[in-house]
Amino acid sequence: MSIPGLGQIAPQQPTTSTTRTITLRPFWEWRFEVPRSSIPTTNAAISAIGLGGAGAGGGGATVRLTSGTAERDGTELALNRTYTFPRNTQSKLLTYTGATLEVSGAFVDSVAQYPAPEASPQLPVLNLHFALQELRAAAAAGGSNHNNNNTNGGGAPGPRVMICGEKDSGKTTVARTLAALATRAGGQPLVGSVDPREGMLALPGTVSAAVFGTVMDVEDPAAGFGVSGTPSSGPSAVPVKLPMVYYVGRERVDEDVPLWRDLVGKLGSAVRDKFAADEVVREAGLLLDTPAASVAKGDLEVLTHVVNEFAGGLLGAGRTAGWQLTVTVNIVVVLGSVDLHAELQRRFENQRTVHGEAITLILLDKSDGVAERDKDFMKFTREAAIKEYFFGDAKRTLSPFTQSVSFDDVAVFRTPDALERAEVSAEMSHWTLAVMNASVNDPPEVIRQAPVMGFVAIADVDEDRRRLKVLSPVSGRLGNRPMIWGRWPEPYINLLG
């Protein structure tokens, strides 16, 4: 289908008031970007970028819904509550019924108008949600009529959706929106990400999955996928999620494909176990975000591997006899790439899941509101996530535990090619290390594929005294837990500087 994006108007011009009122009609979107630093204050520059509100150089945008309904990536805003969006936020607010917003602060914004709901890029996503809800209802009905002693938990589980597309195609936004809509409908879907570039409910450089059964944080720069949605030593604005996390320690999959494959397999096994143990989660299904992929770059094997790992030997690659996996990707959503859709359709057209289902390919147009994220944006996002993990944000201040430990009391492993014990040195300063749920006496392959317990930051290395200053989110000795020093995220930052 075509999404023309008709009626998009020029960015709003500045006003003399610090607060503006924006009126949205049904299916209109208010799109905004809070810059990383100050906004130009000359009249010409302001006119060029459309400064929302006054007070250039402010640290964020504030929004209040005064009438109607509005949501951010599927999570509703409460009426007459003030929301603050921090620096480096790129997002939108959508209304299905019409809404009035009061906005203030320093940001770039515009209103996307559509002559009819059919022209909105959100309508296909909403229709997809309703179709998934029908599949969830069918799974619930099938499960209730099946013998509960079956180890597979009944018939086919709810929909298992893999979302893919090229770089900056809106994959994560669609995954987040579908998760929020499913949660609002009373479901508890499993949501996963096998893209190490950003991290979901964890620091960048990881793959993870978690049950989403509660509301997401509207004010989170990642709209509910950030580290603010996980347990911490301080209060949380929303109920926290409990992710299963595996540490890749690389930015891109192609930097270490064998390692990524192994960890995706571990994540698939964790998802399988959760489906087997929790009927409610099983009925809600899976929503899986994937790394950017294109036919031209030869990324198809990455997506094929994801389907294979979450499909119980669907493609018959390297599975032992008796391999059973209840989590089977049966829906592949492709955003904005006709070539990618056609190639995946060709690869999967004759395949069936372990439940006898055909794999459905769905092509959705890329939203005209998707923002392109440059290297500076991604670097700021990574550093902000690390800082928030240890120190919290504007709503929640955390005080990391600082301890001085001897070189002899820690076990650090590094990953140049294979995992090996590393000598502690000044080079380690300001890096973030993953603490693994394993023992230092375990074989290297066990340590490398173990789940992540948490992260620590090396604030300082004193080679003369052979001491490390370590920041951790909670108090407690590191004990015999091995730590992995990866290649990424970098460049590293001085959290205490």
Swiss-Prot record:
It comes from the Eukaryota. Keywords: ATP-binding, mRNA processing, Nucleotide-binding, Nucleus. GO terms for cellular component: mRNA cleavage factor complex. This is mRNA cleavage and polyadenylation factor CLP1. One of its GO terms (molecular function) is ATP binding. GO terms for biological process: mRNA 3'-end processing; tRNA splicing, via endonucleolytic cleavage and ligation. Pfam families: Clp1 (PF06807), CLP1_N (PF16573), CLP1_P (PF16575). ATP binds at residues 29, 168-173. It comes from Chaetomium globosum (strain ATCC 6205 / CBS 148.51 / DSM 1962 / NBRC 6347 / NRRL 1970). Its main location: nucleus. Component of a pre-mRNA cleavage factor complex. Interacts directly with PCF11. Belongs to the Clp1 family. Clp1 subfamily. Residues 1-20 are annotated as: Disordered.
